[in-house]
């Protein structure tokens, strides 16, 4: 936009400024235009020419090299007035310029407002078109997104269902795997136990084989020696047969000697019978002790309804003495795997390992009331005992049934003997309460009941081989069910001792 303004006073001041600062050439006569660009607006000012009556400046009128006159120049007052006039004109022009500036600013504000309004209207229409286009595009995109979302939801639902099915299948598989793992662990534990038992059995079998080999070698040596002895005997027999007359003579001499011995024995029996009538017989070791014999050893005692006396070992040292020993184990020199008759009448030597005999035990305990004391020792040297306040057994018809009362001692808080009554069993007389025949399985003769927690007549095992032996000399509540003891002693004493 171009605005043409003409101001006389503005032209005059510009003419004066032009006269003061520059000279125009004669060929530039007429009007002069001054164009000012301000942003988008251009302003053109028409300026009139000056009249050419400008006075020469002081520098042109005076010679700078001339001497100063004594009196002031006549033009000085005129210049002062002219300067004041110019200052007054400048003030007026300044006011006009300020008004012009205000006018331009106000016009520019209204024009700028109009331009902005037009621009806003144009922009609004454009924005509406763009908004409408965007809305349509947004609606289309929204529809597409909705379709995609629906497809994603459907696919997600299918995946979730499949994932759930897979989770259930995985859970079932994990459960089955856990069960199989537990079964495998149980099988492994059983296999470990079986391997351990097999190793133990192999060790035992190896030891038994070594023992059998040693016994075989010993037997072979014994057979060799016996063969040699038999050969020597055969030689002697051949020599004796050849000398029949000498044998007949010796036979006659032996017959005479036998007759003499028979006569002497008859006299000795008659003499002993007379002494028995004179001396009071001992019923048990308590009578021996009370008769003044307080040293442990072998003594002869007599039983009611028994034709012959019996040699027994009397313990005079344990718990004030007077104990009649009915069983003793110490070194395994005697085999306790015997039949009913041998356990009935007894076997062994009272000075070592022996069993007194069930018939004699019944005869003693039928005389008066007795207590029972059992002394035990393990292979580590530990000693213990079990004592019963009442002890007796039945007769043979009752299978020598055991009767006990009142248990005390250090060999376990509970009794390893059956208190309520158990019949005696041997390998040839099964009187226990078990189908397994305890006497055959556990060896020895004992009051087994249903095999029970004790067997002091079992197999004797030496040190190092006494563990894990169910058929050994056992007392369950002292050393457990499979520990074979080193020594045992069963002894009885009258309750009123």
UniProtKB/Swiss-Prot annotation:
GO MF entries: identical protein binding; receptor ligand activity; receptor tyrosine kinase binding; signaling receptor binding
Signal peptide, first to last residue: 1-19
Keywords noted in UniProt: Angiogenesis, Coiled coil, Developmental protein, Differentiation, Disulfide bond, Glycoprotein, Secreted, Signal
InterPro entries for this protein: FIB_ANG-like, Fibrinogen-like_C, Fibrinogen_a/b/g_C_1, Fibrinogen_a/b/g_C_dom, Fibrinogen_CS
Any Pfam family: ANG-1
Gene3D superfamilies tied to this protein: Gamma Fibrinogen, chain A, domain 1, Gamma-fibrinogen Carboxyl Terminal Fragment, domain 2
SUPFAM superfamilies on file: Fibrinogen C-terminal domain-like
Assembly mode: Homooligomer. Interacts with TEK/TIE2. Interacts with SVEP1/polydom. Interacts with THBD; this interaction significantly inhibits the generation of activated PC and TAFIa/CPB2 by the thrombin/thrombomodulin complex.
Function, as annotated: Binds and activates TIE2 receptor by inducing its tyrosine phosphorylation. Implicated in endothelial developmental processes later and distinct from that of VEGF. Appears to play a crucial role in mediating reciprocal interactions between the endothelium and surrounding matrix and mesenchyme. Mediates blood vessel maturation/stability. It may play an important role in the heart early development.
Protein name: Angiopoietin-1
Organism: Rattus norvegicus (Rat)
């Amino acid at each position: 936009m171009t605005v043409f303004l003409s101001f006389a006073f503005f032209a005059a001041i510009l003419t004066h400024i032009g006269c003061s600062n520059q000279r125009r050439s004669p060929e530039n006569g007429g009007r002069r235009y001054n164009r000012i660009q301000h942003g988008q607006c251009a302003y053109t000012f028409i300026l009139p020419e000056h009249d050419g009556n400008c006075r020469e400046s002081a520098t042109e009128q005076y010679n700078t090299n001339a001497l100063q006159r004594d009196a002031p120049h006549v033009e000085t007052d005129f210049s002062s007035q002219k300067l004041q006039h110019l200052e007054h004109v400048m003030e007026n022009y300044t006011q006009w310029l300020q008004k012009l500036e205000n006018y331009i600013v106000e016009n520019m504000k209204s024009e700028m407002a109009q331009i902005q309004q037009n621009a806003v209207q144009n922009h609004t229409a454009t924005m509406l078109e763009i908004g409408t286009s965007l809305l349509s595009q947004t609606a289309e995109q929204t529809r597409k997104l909705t379709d995609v979302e629906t497809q994603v939801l459907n696919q997600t639902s299918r995946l979730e269902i499949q994932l759930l099915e897979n989770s259930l299948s995985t859970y079932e598989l994990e459960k089955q795997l856990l069960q199989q793992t537990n079964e495998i662990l149980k099988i492994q534990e059983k296999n470990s136990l079986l391997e351990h038992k097999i190793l133990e059995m192999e060790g035992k079998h190896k030891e038994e084989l070594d023992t059998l080999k040693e016994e075989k070698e010993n037997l072979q040596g014994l057979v060799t020696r016996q063969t040699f002895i038999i050969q020597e005997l055969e030689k002697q027999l051949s020599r004796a047969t050849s000398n029949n007359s000498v044998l007949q003579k010796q036979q006659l001499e032996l017959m005479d000697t036998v007759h003499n011995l028979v006569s002497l024995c008859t006299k000795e029996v008659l003499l002993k019978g007379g002494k028995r009538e004179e001396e009071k017989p001992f019923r048990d070791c308590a009578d021996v002790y009370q008769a003044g014999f307080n040293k442990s050893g072998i003594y002869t005692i007599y039983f009611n309804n028994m034709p012959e006396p019996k040699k027994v070992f009397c313990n005079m040292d344990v718990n004030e003495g007077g104990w009649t020993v009915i069983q003793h184990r110490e070194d395994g020199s005697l085999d306790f795997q015997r039949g009913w008759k041998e356990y009935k009448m007894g076997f062994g030597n009272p000075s070592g390992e022996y069993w007194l005999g069930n018939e004699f035990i019944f005869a003693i305990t039928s005389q008066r009331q007795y207590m029972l004391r059992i002394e035990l020792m393990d292979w580590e040297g530990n000693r213990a005992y079990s004592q019963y306040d009442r002890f007796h057994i039945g007769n043979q018809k009752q299978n020598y049934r055991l009767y006990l009362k009142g248990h005390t001692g250090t060999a376990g808080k509970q009794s390893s003997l059956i208190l309520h009554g158990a019949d005696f069993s041997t390998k040839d007389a099964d009187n226990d309460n078990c189908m397994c025949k305890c006497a055959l399985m556990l060896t020895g003769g004992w009051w087994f009941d249903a095999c029970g927690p004790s067997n002091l007549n079992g197999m004797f095992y030496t040190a190092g081989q006494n563990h894990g032996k169910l058929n050994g000399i056992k007392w369950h509540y002292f050393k457990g069910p499979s520990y074979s003891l080193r020594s045992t002693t069963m002894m009885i004493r009258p309750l009123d001792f």
